[in-house]
Amino acid sequence: MAEDDVRDGETWHQFGFPDPERKEYLALQAERPTEVGPADRRMLLEGFDFLALVSHSCFRIGERPVVVIWRRNGVVDVIVRSADCTVDQRRTLKGAAAEKLLSAVLATHADAWTEPFEPKEPVLDGYSWDMTVYAGSRYFECCGDNAAPREVAELLRAVADAGLPLAWDGEEIAFACANEEGDHE
């Protein structure tokens, strides 16, 4: 990703992202975004400031559902944008509601996802996803094809429980079951 970074005046931009919130977040950083190695991922996840979860489909180029979780100033902003932008909602969470969502982020154990997630029997459906977790100018990425881990589905449910719509792939989440055969929910 670093080769796509540019400095425009005093702002870092990473090209190719559909979420203006990421551009705003990166504009606040004084340093060039730096990807961390596996040893630093857990600490970064526990102290994250910004998380962007994006779904991709080769059949819907340029239309990507986005979930952004931004922790700042003692509150958590959650933004949900559907692929076609018919849903574009933001909610600010405080107290117990914010802690519940932050617990769901930590429960993903995304720090351990160092390889692309692929179900045992993949289907060439053109679907993929990625999640980028930032703490300051440091970040790590997770990604997968066809399906997402059950923990991503649980994170999306936590976003829905916070009162935001589940605007993700037409309200369908593809994820791998415990038996690794794959399923939809």
Spans of features found by a protein language model:
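Short, well-ordered, aromatic-rich surface patches in folded extracellular/luminal domains
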Residues: 3-61, 66, 83-185
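Conserved beta-hairpin
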Residues: 67-71
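N-terminal glycine/threonine-rich, aromatic-flanked beta-hairpin/loop signature
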Residues: 73-83
